[in-house]
Each structure stands twice: as structure tokens, then as C-alpha cells.
């Protein structure tokens, strides 16, 4: 459907899926930082946070040969003024989302019809949509959701365009 995406990945994801992490970049998508171990960022020390962010980026480069894009999504959306400043000082823009649902539990998926209805009800101009790539419901519904939103006149843009 020619829709850009930014995949926020952890070091563990890159380690377990090196081919997919590489393919994301090869296919023209953005790959953003989601830290090494997915901690609550406000709960870690300055030094630990630096390592969480730089360690993930360095591993991405080592394994795939590609640099991460300069975006970071805080694990669980947890942040503080301190973590926002550290992230900015490292050259990242912190990205949050405006649309999401509980799609990350692979053992409790709501189904494609729920996903489609959710997006039909809650979509809006400028939405940043959070979808976890482990979700079978997302995989089943994504083509329909994209076609429906395009039919309503929406255009999908990369984070660089926002």
C-alpha cells in the first residue's frame, strides 16, 4: 500500500530478528530507538539511560549496517523532563502516539474486526498510530484499515514529514 512506517525496536528485537530489522531499512521505512532492555526511563540513572539509548543504536549499526533514525519512543510511554532532555542531547526526537490499543499481548488479541472498528472510530488528522508488530490482529486488519483511511482522503506520512 506504499505506506511509510517507523519501527521502534529494542536490542532484543534486533538480536532475534536481524533480517527483519535490516529489511525495514531496505524497504525504505524508518527504524527508531526503543532502548536496549525496555526499562521505565525515569527509573534508570543517567549513565544507564545513556547506555540504553546508545547501546541500541550501536547494536543496530553493528548487526544491520544501518543507522537508526533519530527518533525514540519511550518504553511504555514513561518519561520525565530529565529523560526528555537526555534524549534530546543525544540527538533524538521523542515520539509519542495519539492512537493505540492493547495489541502487545500475543496471547490476548482482539481480532481484526476490533482493530478495524477502533481505527474507524478514533482516527483523526495528524494521528501517530502505535501498532505493535507482534500483533496478529494488526497483521490481519492493516490492509483494510489503510484502504479505508485512504478512501476517506487521508495520506500517510513519515515522521520526517510531521
Regions found by a protein language model. Give the residues of each.
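Short glycine/serine/threonine-biased micro-segments
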Residues: 30, 75, 124
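Terminal accessory/targeting
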Residues: 1-5, 125-162
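Alpha-helical scaffold elements lining the catalytic groove of polysaccharide deacetylases
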Residues: 39-64, 78-125, 138-141
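Active-site-proximal beta-strand/loop segments in catalytic clefts of secreted hydrolases
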Residues: 8-12, 35-36, 73-77, 97-100, ...
Amino acid at each position: 500500500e506504499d505506506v511509510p512506517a517507523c519501527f521502534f525496536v529494542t536490542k532484543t528485537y534486533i538480536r532475534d530478528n536481524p533480517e527483519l530489522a535490516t529489511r525495514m531499512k531496505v524497504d525504505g521505512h524508518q527504524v527508531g530507538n526503543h532502548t536496549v532492555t525496555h526499562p521505565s526511563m525515569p527509573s534508570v540513572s543517567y549513565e544507564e539511560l545513556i547506555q540504553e539509548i546508545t547501546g541500541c543504536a550501536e547494536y543496530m549499526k553493528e548487526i544491520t549496517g544501518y543507522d537508526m533514525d533519530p527518533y525514540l519512543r519511550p518504553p511504555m510511554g514513561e518519561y520525565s523532563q530529565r529523560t526528555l532532555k537526555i534524549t534530546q542531547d543525544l540527538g533524538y526526537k521523542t515520539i509519542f502516539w495519539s492512537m493505540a490499543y492493547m495489541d502487545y499481548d500475543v496471547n490476548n488479541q482482539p481480532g481484526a474486526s476490533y482493530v478495524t472498528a477502533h481505527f474507524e472510530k478514533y482516527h483523526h488528522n495528524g494521528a501517530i498510530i502505535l501498532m505493535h508488530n507482534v500483533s496478529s490482529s494488526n497483521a490481519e486488519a492493516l490492509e483494510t484499515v489503510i484502504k479505508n483511511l485512504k478512501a476517506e482522503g487521508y495520506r500517510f506520512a513519515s515522521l520526517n514529514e510531521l
